Amino acid sequence: MKFDKSILREADIRGVYGTQIKPAFATRLGLVFGSYLKTINVKTVVVGHDNRIGGVELSKNLVDALTSTGIDVIFIGLVTTPILNFASRELGVEYGIMVTASHNPACDNGFKLFGKNYQHCDYDELKIIYDALSNREYKIYTGKGTIKNLEINDLYSKRMRESISLGNRKMKVVVDPGNGTASIIVKKIYNRFPFDVVFINDVSDPTFPNHHPDPNVKANMKQLCDAVIEHSADLGLAYDGDADRCGFVDNNGEVIDADILMALMCKNILKTSENKTVLIDVKCSNTLRDEILACKGIIYLDTPSSAKQERDMEENNIVFGGGYSNHIFFRDKHPGYDDGIYVGLRVQELLSHTKLNLTDMLKKLNTYYHTDEIKVKTTDELKFKIVDAI
């Protein structure tokens, strides 16, 4: 079939729903992915979708196509991307597809493909799938796969509570799902904790009417900053559209960059872990590097690709990692996938064991001056050419 190949990205598929990403494309993807799985003797795949426009339609076409190739589908419905990652591990099913465009504009949708070791499909697998999408000669298998509908959210929220060990400190937190997919689960999770919680923008709405759910853009954090001050909260947390990232606001209503937050977490993690390696990306500040070295840690420098970071952490047995984009990974008492809600809870766990507020803790770190991330607008076609040239 013909389609705009610019939707095929380094780690996932994303484009405008209705023009670049259509239900017919989901059908083709399901046929190709299912047929590829048959060639490597994989029998089952987990499928979920976030709250974006078109998610239900894309999922239906995807699932129908997968089963028509003989693949069994465990369909978990409306979930965050981390819940799909969780479900795959609980079920022992490595391969999965999440219908999402993450933090892209509200008009977009797409697909994240997961494979070996429950991680994003690597370059070699994606190349096979991407090439096959437009290859009429690619063999499409036929069969009669089954569909099992599974509710996994309750078990996910239960596991969240079990994984967090709180101290005696009582805390107030403001949580902003940004009308994204975290809206469907975050209250259920926080009901299991003794926190005083204020929720804002907590109704699922794929048009994102209050602000875009991308915590890496400080303008999107203004409502949260104001709410933290208004409610005298200890912490503010915001998630992106599919909740694999978390943004942070301190008790003074100031946004904390992800690398600075990681610097706070390092000491706590490295003091109890025999593994002292921490993965950071090239955009992280010297504040984080200083803290890792002060804790006698080892720095593993990586690219800003969260999919690659997750694989590198697994392959090199790295205990903690992340980058400036707010993707953060724990592998001390967590499987290591990026989960914004879990990251926020780990920060609260840390705070619950100290009398210091977040601002005072930040003052103990070395300070360096830097510019905010600068992004230059260009077309997808030009963007990829520029990156290749560099």
What are the residue ranges of the model-derived segments?
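Phosphate-binding and adjacent anionic-ligand microenvironments
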Residues: 273-390
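Gly/Ser/Thr-enriched, mixed-charge loops and adjacent short helices
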Residues: 109-231
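Glycine-rich phosphate-binding loop
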Residues: 93-102, 108, 228-250, 255, ...
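N-terminal small/polar loop signature for handling phosphorylated ligands or for N-terminal nucleophile
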Residues: 39, 44-109, 189-249
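General beta-strand structural signal in soluble alpha/beta enzymes
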Residues: 9, 47, 73-77, 98-99, ...
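An N-terminal, well-structured beta->alpha segment
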Residues: 1-64, 68-69, 95, 149-172
